[in-house]
């Protein structure tokens, strides 16, 4: 039973690459043909690469490690959040803050601040503070929630993999992961550099359906890996 079918990939438009003038020659092995000025991705390779990434992510989670989903472009934000939550993992879908991995200690102080503000809202502290101050604190909480809400429970030292939508956009995240020796799994379009990625999934990173389909398979791998870990206990 294959992880993903050609039919699913076709229906989601995973095969549509970028315009031929906006390409990275290193992606040539993953290109099937060119049609109307657009590169068409070889979906047989995508099927194989999804399977490789799936097995890798599954083994990472079965070893008790965590996975971070990263996709801050509009087309990816919703799928990144929903699929990471469905699989009980972590996500960044608004903005990658410098040092999110390499300087997690500093980021952790911001997370603590967010948790403190949440507690203040819950225990009624906001109700007894001056209105002006509450507005200021609520705005701060909202901003922190947007940027850090998805990594509140992340243990950066236990990160086994990072999943990326659009390596060009998420270059800072990739650099930090590389710096720490964390393997990178990514949806790589025809305009990206595959050399930076440990597990390349050639595919359209601009269509919401394409992004959701592949992201959901990564989440499935996590869920299956977790079941394996539970069985081993």
Curated annotation (Swiss-Prot):
Protein name stated in the entry: Small ribosomal subunit protein uS2
Family: Belongs to the universal ribosomal protein uS2 family.
Single Gene Ontology MF annotation: structural constituent of ribosome
Gene Ontology cellular component list: cytosolic small ribosomal subunit
InterPro entries named in the record: Ribosomal_uS2, Ribosomal_uS2_bac/mit/plastid, Ribosomal_uS2_CS, Ribosomal_uS2_flav_dom_sf
Any single biological process term in GO: translation
Keywords for the protein's UniProt record, in alphabetical order: Ribonucleoprotein, Ribosomal protein
Keyword Membrane appears in the UniProt entry: no
HAMAP family attached to this UniProt entry: Ribosomal_uS2_B
PANTHER family xrefs: 30S RIBOSOMAL PROTEIN S2 PROKARYOTIC AND ORGANELLAR (PTHR12534), SMALL RIBOSOMAL SUBUNIT PROTEIN US2M (PTHR12534:SF0)
